[in-house]
Amino acid sequence: MEGEELIYHNIINEILVGYIKYYMNDISEHELSPYQQQIKKILTYYDDCLNKQVTITFSLTSAQEIKTQFTEVVTELFKDLINWGRICGFIVFSARMAKYCKDANNHLESTVITTAYNFMKHNLLPWMISHGGQEEFLAFSLHSDIYSVIFNIKYFLSKFCNHMFLKSCVHLLRNCNLI
């Protein structure tokens, strides 16, 4: 890798791969870069909000199934718009899926990470670069408020709760009127 590709690789590792590894408990918070520690805050907040809204159960048994279903889900998420909030949802979703694979001991978490990495590289990174890159993502993370988080969680749930990939989406909070 050289030049521009190395820069892109570093951006994806900072934003996506670092958080997934932290989420799976493969690295500690102290091993995160200062930048990763900052974005971890908003991603953890997104995850907490999502966790309060719905329980997502995965059914993943093969690398091909992960690639196909992951791509279907995230393509649906971004089919009409890319924004920083949806990118946060994408990262949290990727981390949850990887952790599920690790916890299920099916040794497929690396497939999730590779699939998420490739999707971000080919589908999201050009938008991210043209919208300020890491600096703008961090600015979004630091200035995101509860309303934008809830809005993006609602959107995330509306896209995924009826998707065949998810076996169940239960425990919606009645007072949030999510979908």
From Swiss-Prot:
Signal peptide: none annotated. SMART domains: BCL. Induction: Expressed in the early phase of the viral replicative cycle. Expressed in the late phase of the viral replicative cycle. A motif (BH2) lies at residues 126-141. Keywords: Early protein, Host endoplasmic reticulum, Host mitochondrion, Host-virus interaction, Inhibition of host apoptosis by viral BCL2-like protein, Inhibition of host autophagy by virus, Late protein, Modulation of host cell apoptosis by virus. A motif (BH1) lies at residues 76-95. GO terms for cellular component: host cell endoplasmic reticulum; host cell mitochondrion. It is found in: Host mitochondrion; Host endoplasmic reticulum. One of its GO terms (molecular function) is BH domain binding. Gene3D superfamilies: Blc2-like. GO terms for biological process: regulation of apoptotic process; symbiont-mediated suppression of host apoptosis; symbiont-mediated suppression of host autophagy. The keyword ATP-binding does not apply. Suppresses apoptosis in host cell to promote the viral replication. Has the ability to potentially bind to all the members of the proapoptotic Bcl-2 family. Inhibits autophagy by interacting with host Beclin 1 (BECN1). Belongs to the Bcl-2 family. Interacts with host BECN1 (via BH3 homology domain); this interaction allows the virus to inhibit BECN1, and thus autophagy. Interacts with host BID. Interacts with host BAX. This is Apoptosis regulator Bcl-2 homolog.
